[in-house]
């Protein structure tokens, strides 16, 4: 999972203006970096121009995903990431960056701004921080921990039953489980095996 670009733009009536951008082109060869960066800027502007105000979208281009968020006040953000990067985290990043940007940069400067004239320095740190979505986004971190716990629990149950025992045999021999619980287990087992075949 990788983020390549984080841009803040202004969607004007006649054209879209790049206000500030941060790039991570370290995974590209040295000679390709400037061209890749220019292409990301061009793509970001084009996507914002073609998007309606008040919209969010994800545009796939080969193995990359461009996530765009255009607010109703014409301020827009674009994240370019690989296709594995979680969309929810990308949109969370865009919302956070646009909120910070609108608080720090006067709205009057948006239509005529440029990367040289706009004084906002938060993009590089945000791009770096969100490279690992698990660390940056609490929900993703919790989901990853749940997935790991589920794997550990699954492995533990399998290791308990590896000695030639079957869970079905243990359930039928159990003195703790009532008749109703055993019937419920057998019914659930049949339904799950039926669905697994399909």
Curated annotation (Swiss-Prot):
Principal place of residence: cytoplasm
Enzyme superclass (EC): transferase
Subcellular location: Cytoplasm, Cytosol; Cytoplasmic vesicle membrane; Golgi apparatus membrane
Post-translational changes noted in the entry: Palmitoylated; catalyzes its own palmitoylation. Palmitoylation is required for Golgi targeting.
Limits of the v-SNARE coiled-coil homology domain: 138-198
Source species, domain of life: Eukaryota
Keywords of this entry: Coiled coil, Cytoplasm, Cytoplasmic vesicle, ER-Golgi transport, Golgi apparatus, Lipoprotein, Membrane, Methylation, Palmitate, Phosphoprotein, Prenylation, Protein transport, Transferase, Transport
Propeptide: 196-198
PTM-bearing positions, type Phosphoserine: 159
BP-aspect Gene Ontology terms: endoplasmic reticulum to Golgi vesicle-mediated transport; protein transport; vesicle docking involved in exocytosis; vesicle targeting
Record carries keyword Protein transport: yes
Lipid anchor positions (S-farnesyl cysteine): 195
Matches recorded under Gene3D superfamilies: 1.20.5.110, Longin domain
Keyword Signal part of the UniProt annotation: no
EC number: 2.3.1.-
SMART domains recorded: Longin (SM01270)
GO cellular component terms listed in the entry, alphabetical order: cytoplasmic vesicle membrane; cytosol; endoplasmic reticulum; Golgi apparatus; Golgi membrane; plasma membrane
Gene Ontology molecular-function annotations: protein-cysteine S-palmitoyltransferase activity; SNAP receptor activity
Residues that bear Cysteine methyl ester: 195
Record remark: domains: The longin domain regulates palmitoylation and membrane targeting.
PANTHER family: SYNAPTOBREVIN HOMOLOG YKT6 (PTHR45806:SF1)
Assembly behavior: Identified in 2 different SNARE complexes; the first one composed of GOSR1, GOSR2 and STX5 and the second one composed of BET1L, GOSR1 and STX5.
Family to which this protein belongs: Belongs to the synaptobrevin family.
Protein name: Synaptobrevin homolog YKT6
Organism field: Bos taurus
Name of the gene encoding the protein in the UniProt record: YKT6
């Amino acid at each position: 999972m990788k983020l390549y670009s984080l841009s803040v733009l202004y969607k004007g009536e006649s054209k879209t203006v790049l206000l500030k951008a941060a790039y991570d082109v370290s995974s590209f060869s040295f000679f390709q970096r400037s061209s890749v960066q220019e292409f990301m800027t061009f793509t970001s502007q084009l996507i914002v121009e073609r998007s309606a105000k008040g919209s969010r979208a994800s545009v796939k281009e080969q193995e990359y995903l461009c996530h765009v968020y255009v607010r109703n006040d014409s301020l827009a953000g674009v994240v370019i990431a690989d296709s594995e990067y979680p969309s929810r985290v990308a949109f969370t990043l865009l919302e956070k960056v646009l909120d910070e940007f609108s608080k720090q940069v006067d709205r009057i400067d948006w239509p005529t701004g440029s990367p040289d004239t706009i004084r906002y320095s938060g993009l590089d740190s945000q791009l770096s921080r969100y490279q690992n979505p698990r660390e940056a986004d609490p929900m993703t971190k919790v989901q990853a921990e749940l997935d790991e716990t589920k794997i550990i629990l699954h492995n533990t149950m399998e290791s308990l039953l590896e000695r030639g025992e079957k869970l079905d045999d243990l359930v039928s021999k159990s003195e703790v489980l009532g008749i109703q619980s055993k019937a419920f287990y057998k019914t659930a087992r049949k339904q799950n095996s039926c669905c697994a075949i399909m």
